[in-house]
UniProtKB/Swiss-Prot annotation:
Domain HD as annotated: residue spans: 62-198
GO BP terms, alphabetized: dGTP catabolic process
Protein name as it appears in the record: Deoxyguanosinetriphosphate triphosphohydrolase-like protein
Family annotation (HAMAP family): dGTPase_type2
Gene Ontology terms for molecular function: dGTPase activity
Pfam families assigned: HD, HD_assoc
Source taxon at top rank: Bacteria
Family indicated by similarity: Belongs to the dGTPase family. Type 2 subfamily.
Entry-linked InterPro entries: dGTPase, dGTPase-like, dNTPase_2, HD/PDEase_dom, HD_domain, PHydrolase_assoc_dom
Species of the source: Rickettsia felis (strain ATCC VR-1525 / URRWXCal2) (Rickettsia azadi)
């Protein structure tokens, strides 16, 4: 049974374009299925999490990451008697707006767009789901419920300063109450993302030999897990050891999140969802000690993994590809596919840049590489 402060699909604020309900799925389940059927969701399979897609079959990509986030979000929401369908749906959609090549690609595209109000993957997720996906005759986008769209836009908290242009524009026709917190389910999705990415980036980085177990000693709480597991299993292999460490880490983080969130709910005597939205802090959270550990782990990953020679070298190449494609298309829109070129008023530089950014952001890693080789390479074999 859902808690009184849960997002009840029967009490949804509805969709921008009214639709009749179905008898066999609730509104949030319908949204989950719509997201899974989008082209943008399928493309996540070929978009970078940390390692470029073709570097290895077992490294995570944006799709596997999104699926892992959704399982954590669903488990946490279920335990707290919240809507697991809503938490899962927001988690599945949270990375739809990412560019090819992960954060390196986003930084590169944002730099290209600095004269045109920049680029944000969060705003791009909203744009994909409300405009760019063309699956219905009656409207653009996939017409998701208010609760899902609110959760995607505000899962990291209220938006009050420097509101992204597209978010502000969309908000005029469908008020997402940007100055308040999102539902507890959306907050769960955001922290499920943290749990998944720090755990699995550690795992993938050890698998790629960017870091080793000796370097994990910098993170004392994780080093303690390593010690306990090696003490229990004397002859454990390195590959199995990292799986055990990650499993223990995820369990520890979820347990901590559940405990602190229950404490917050009891302390605030929360009885309805509006009280969650109007609080001056997010109700779903870790303990202070765990928040410090997460901050420490993110710093470790940033310094030892994301800034490593291997990742930096790849990031430089990815930056060159994104910026090269942007310049080529800006110089000659005839190089764009016909359906994209038709959207552009060639006399208006701003709208041209935004449409080109939408096109590049939707590319997979391999398609971006292929396009770059075709359009920017001096190798005549590519022509």
């Amino acid at each position: 049974m859902l808690a009184s402060y849960a997002s009840d699909p029967l009490k949804s604020r509805g969709r921008l374009y009214k639709e009749l309900p179905t008898s066999y799925r609730n509104e949030f389940e319908r949204d989950r299925d719509r997201i899974i059927h989008t082209n943008a969701f399928r493309r996540l399979q070929y978009k970078t999490q940390v390692f470029i897609n073709h570097e290895g079959d077992h490294y995570r990509n944006r799709l596997t990451h999104s699926l892992e986030v959704s399982t954590v979000a669903r488990s946490v929401a279920n335990t707290l008697n919240l809507s697991s369908d809503l938490a899962e749906t927001i988690a599945l959609a949270h990375d739809l707006g990412h560019t090819p090549f992960g954060h390196a690609g986003e930084r590169a595209l944002n730099e290209c767009m600095k004269e045109y109000n920049g680029f944000s993957h969060n705003a791009q997720s909203l744009k994909i789901l409300t405009l760019l996906e063309k699956r219905y005759a009656a409207y653009n986008g996939v017409n998701l419920t208010w609760e899902v769209l609110e959760g995607i836009v505000k899962h990291n908290g209220p938006i009050t300063d420097e509101i992204n242009e597209y978010i502000a524009e969309y908000n005029k026709q469908n008020d997402l109450e940007l100055s308040t917190y999102a539902s507890a389910e959306a907050q769960i999705a955001a922290l499920a993302d943290d749990i998944s990415y720090i755990s699995h980036d550690l795992e993938d980085s050890i698998g790629a030999k960017i870091i080793d177990f000796n370097s994990l000693a910098e993170l004392k709480y994780i080093d303690q897990h390593v010690f306990e597991i090696k003490t229990k299993f004397k002859n454990i292999s390195s590959s199995c050891l990292i799986y055990e460490v990650v499993r223990k880490l995820i369990h520890e983080l979820i347990t901590d999140l559940l405990w602190q969130t229950k404490e917050n709910l009891n302390k605030e005597k929360i009885t309805n969802i509006d009280e969650i939205r109007n609080l001056n802090y997010q109700i779903v959270d870790f303990t202070e000690k765990t928040n410090e550990r997460i901050k420490e782990t993110k710093k470790f990953l940033h310094e030892r993994v994301y800034k490593s020679n291997k990742i930096t070298a790849i990031s430089l190449k990815c930056t060159k590809i994104v910026q090269g494609l942007f310049k080529v298309y800006m110089d000659d829109i005839n190089l764009l596919p016909v359906n994209w070129k038709m959207l552009i008023d060639s006399n208006e530089t701003y709208s041209k840049a935004r449409i080109i950014a939408d096109y590049i952001a939707g590319m997979t890693d391999r398609f971006a590489i292929q396009e770059y080789n075709q359009l920017c390479s001096l190798n005549f074999n590519n022509i």
